[in-house]
Structure formats: C-alpha cells, structure tokens
C-alpha cells in the first residue's frame, strides 16, 4: 500500500466520481485553528454552539463562579474557543442536508466515540455535536496524525488539506452493510460489516446478496476507481438496491473484518461457500457470522473509557467534571 492509494480514498477524491451512487454530502475545508482545537487534549470544553449568550455579564455570584475558577497560583477562564464563520458554514450545510448529518474527516468517522453522545449515536445537528465526537475519537486523531501508517513507500508525506465531510443522516440497518475487497480490479471477498452480530437473513440470502453486490461492482465500480486494489463499503436496502458508502485502502490500515490480510494479499483460502454453479462463475468469497454462538464483542468497546473519564470517575480532575456538566446542560438547552 502506497501513500497515493491512501490519498485516492479521501472522500473528496472519490465523491465527485460516484456522487449518484452514494448519500448526498457536503465537503467543507477545515480551518487550521479548528484542527488545532480538535487536537488539543487539554480541555473537554466543546465549542460550536450556535446560540450566543443572552448577556455578557453574569447575573449572580454563583454564575460568575461558574464561569471563572481560580486558586492561589493563577486564574483560568474555562471558555471554549469560538469559530463564528466556520460555525455558520457548518450549520448552513447541516440545514441543506435536512437538519441531521453523519460527520467524518477525509477518511474516518468517529465510530469509536458514539457512546459519548447524549443519544449514543453519530447523528449530529450542530457543530458542538460534531466537536464532541471528534475530540473523543481515536479514529479522528489517527486521520490527523498518522494518515499514512502502514504505507511502504519512503517518500515524504504529502501536505494534507483536511476537510469536514457532512453526510445526510440516514437510518442504516447494520445487518445490511457489507465490505468488499478488490484486488487487480477483481472482487475477491465480501464480508458482513457488523460481524459482531448474527443476522439470519444474511445466512439465508448470501448467494442473492453476493450476486447483487457483484452486479453493482461490475456496472458501477470496476475499472472506474483510481486504483486497481481497494476496499469499498456498500449498503443493500430492503428493496435490494445497493448504495455506495465509502472507499478504503487495500491494506492493514483497513479492518479486514471476517478475513485476514494474509488471506486477502495472498489470495489463499478465498473460495466462496456457495453452490458449484456459483463457484464456476468465479464468485468472491462471502463471509458472515453463521450463528449466535460466534457473536463477538463490539470492536469499539475498548474505546469507551478515555483518560478524561477515568479522571472524572475518580474525582482527580474537577475542571473536567465542571466542563462535562456544562456541556450536558448546554446540549439539553439546545434540544
């Protein structure tokens, strides 16, 4: 896997080519000061609220104390930075997409941080919702700090222009998502995306699902992407229509789900579990969770306790506790 392969999987690189096949989205350049704020792990205060304060002066001593904290050594004002111009652009984009969006950066979405949202979802209605998820996500941090991890070429890292991607919110059923692996422009493997759960309809319809995905690949994807080795995710709705969700590099940086990268790179053990007729047609390997016995824990569970929250639970950082309680109150007011 080379750095150019990673660059080709940026959302803004492929979206113009496949716009008609995927969910409506808006791409906004990410200002440097917003990037700096997202990478700053020194505060849990979340910026991006759309409603300005009703007054500039506190009405009471209690309110003043709520805003400013001091000790014998120094005085610190716990206020979040504001980005009025960017906030306006984001809110306009959210409104144009129906009022709710699924956010991501150039490559990754903050799937590991869904638990921190008040609705335990990646559904966002404001910039503050997005900031909360992004600042809590290791996936987002990796996009910023290690976008070319596992790349084999030694060339200098390209200068990155980061983007906020807002996708129209759609209620997607996890059991209808699949990851597809393409090598030398040939579809070699399909995996159930949510492999931690057993879905009876997948086991019963796997040949039909595989055939449907193959048809979609041959008609819309094959020889049209910028590389010949890549991974793409799709969603198959209740009518059998296939939607393109994302592209990912063909390499270890991408989760191989029910395959191993040794299998995918070498091509061994990739015979599909289908009828002889399907095998004769060179069907890709199709893997799904075959019974409830093989159900596994969610891979995102390990991300659920960041150090900030350990500090909260032990009472070791009073400022972070104050920040979190303010954030919760503000979000309730927004609702």
From Swiss-Prot:
Lineage: Eukaryota, Metazoa, Chordata, Craniata, Vertebrata
UniProt keyword annotations, A-Z: ATP-binding, Chaperone, Cytoplasm, Magnesium, Metal-binding, Nucleotide-binding, Phosphoprotein
Phosphoserine: residues bearing it: 60
Gene field: CDC123
Binding residues annotated for Mg(2+), in chain numbering: 246, 248
Quaternary organization: Interacts with the eIF2 complex gamma subunit EIF2S3 (via C-terminus); the interaction is direct. Interacts with the eIF2 complex alpha subunit EIF2S1. Interacts with the eIF2 complex beta subunit EIF2S2.
Pfam families to which the protein is assigned, alphabetical: D123 (PF07065)
Purpose: ATP-dependent protein-folding chaperone for the eIF2 complex. Binds to the gamma subunit of the eIF2 complex which allows the subunit to assemble with the alpha and beta subunits.
Binding site for ATP: 104, 107, 109, 111, 167-170, 177, 179, 193, 233, 246, 248
Similarity annotation: Belongs to the CDC123 family.
Species the sequence originates in: Bos taurus (Bovine)
GO cellular component: cytoplasm
Domain of life (superkingdom): Eukaryota
Cell compartments where the protein resides: Cytoplasm
Biological processes annotated in GO: eukaryotic translation initiation factor 2 complex assembly
Predominant cellular place of this UniProt entry's protein: cytoplasm
Protein name, entry field: Translation initiation factor eIF2 assembly protein
InterPro entries given in the database record: CDC123 (IPR009772)
Molecular function terms from GO: ATP binding; magnesium ion binding; protein folding chaperone
PTM section of the record: Phosphorylated.
């Amino acid at each position: 896997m080379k750095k150019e392969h990673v660059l080709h999987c940026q959302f803004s690189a492929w979206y113009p080519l496949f716009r008609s096949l995927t969910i409506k989205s808006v791409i906004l350049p990410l200002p440097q000061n917003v990037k700096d704020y997202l990478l700053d792990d020194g505060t849990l205060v979340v910026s991006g609220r759309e409603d300005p304060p009703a007054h500039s002066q506190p009405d009471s001593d209690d309110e003043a104390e709520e805003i400013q904290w001091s000790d014998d050594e120094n005085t610190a004002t716990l206020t979040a930075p504001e980005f009025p111009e960017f906030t306006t652009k984001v809110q306009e984009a959210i409104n144009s997409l129906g009022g709710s969006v699924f956010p991501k950066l150039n490559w990754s979405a903050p799937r590991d941080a869904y638990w921190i949202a008040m609705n335990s979802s990646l559904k966002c209605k404001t910039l503050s919702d997005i900031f909360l998820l992004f600042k809590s996500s290791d996936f987002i941090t990796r996009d910023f700090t290690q976008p070319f991890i596992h790349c084999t070429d030694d060339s200098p890292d390209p200068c990155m222009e980061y983007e906020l991607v807002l996708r129209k919110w759609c209620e997607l059923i996890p059991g209808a998502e699949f990851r597809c692996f393409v090598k030398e422009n040939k579809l070699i493997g399909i995996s159930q995306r949510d492999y931690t759960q057993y879905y009876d309809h997948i086991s019963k319809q796997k040949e039909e699902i595989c055939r449907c995905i193959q048809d979609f690949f041959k008609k819309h994807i094959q020889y049209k992407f910028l590389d010949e080795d890549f991974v793409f995710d799709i969603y198959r709705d209740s009518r059998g229509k296939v939607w393109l969700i994302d592209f990912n590099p063909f390499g270890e940086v991408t989760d191989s789900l029910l395959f191993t990268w040794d299998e995918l790179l070498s091509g061994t053990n990739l015979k599909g579990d289908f009828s002889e007729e399907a095998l004769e047609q060179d069907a890709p390997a199709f893997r799904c969770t075959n019974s409830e016995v093989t159900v596994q824990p969610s891979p995102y569970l390990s991300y659920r306790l960041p150090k900030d929250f350990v500090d909260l639970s032990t009472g070791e950082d009073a400022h972070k506790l104050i920040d979190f309680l303010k954030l919760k109150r503000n979000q309730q007011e927004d609702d």
